[in-house]
């Protein structure tokens, strides 16, 4: 009974985290996917830019949907790419179309992410 209750609570849990973000303008994603096909995409960056592990968000699967919020504006986006990251250690890279939809004009700022 305890295990069933714990499992149900686990299912209700949603990851909500404030993370440092940047944006990028690449045309092709990690699987040769077109990042300008009308979708909204993000790239998961690396914990250490030199190691390129692409797991700053825990190693999300390609296509994983996140609700990304910036200054009160939210957009659902899919993981469409990965990246090394940069010197200030952002965790997520917003594709330029997603950044525009969010009003994300700063090169480096915080966004809130949660599973969609």
Indicate residue ranges for each PLM-predicted region:
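Secreted/periplasmic proteins
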Residues: 8, 13-116
